[in-house]
UniProtKB/Swiss-Prot annotation:
This is Ribosomal RNA large subunit methyltransferase E. The gene is rlmE. The active site is at residue 156. Gene3D superfamilies: Vaccinia Virus protein VP39 (3.40.50.150). PANTHER family: RIBOSOMAL RNA METHYLTRANSFERASE (PTHR10920), RRNA METHYLTRANSFERASE 2, MITOCHONDRIAL (PTHR10920:SF18). Belongs to the class I-like SAM-binding methyltransferase superfamily. RNA methyltransferase RlmE family. It is an enzyme of class 2 (transferase).
Amino acid sequence: MFIKVNTKYFIDQYALQAQNQKLRSRSWFKLQSIDRLDKLLKQGMTVIDLGSTPGGWSSYVIKQISNLGTIVSCDILPMKKIAGVKFLQGDCSNINFLNEIDLKIKHKRAQVVLSDMSPNTTGISTVDVCKSIYLGKIALNMCCRFLAPGGSFLVKIFQGDGFDQYLYNLKCLFHKVKVRKPSSSRSHSREVYIVSKDFKYKRINI
């Protein structure tokens, strides 16, 4: 016997849990799921969180790295303050903004770069995928600037034209690359999360 699952109801459980736990967003559960599987975050780490607003990932990260670590969160939109999180509002493709990030991490390298950046979707899949890949390239370029050798990178990407090439680029730069689809993601969504570990450290532009 087959049981039909009400997808909307299922997804709403994450929104309800987020509300009950007073979390910024249900994206918190996506990062939690991936982190439990891939063990990305540890106490004392330096982390850069791209596309951080409204703060779901940042609030999860600060709990994992504790006050011994450093997290710099970035978004083009404003974000309400989170204790222990250094927030910068600006465009990650702007060189002056990258210099601000460099100052916040005190010219050190991060052990983890996270990107939950997402484009303003149009409903036209080819356009939305193209925009997502573009944001993914910006995030990957930031890895080449800020990520320490052996570091990890987690990025949200829409599957479609250009995805395979992006995945290939990651495999050239990291020793371990895996594609994840957290249960809290909508099953019909094109979004996936790529976990890349053990950065080879190459200063290049993708």
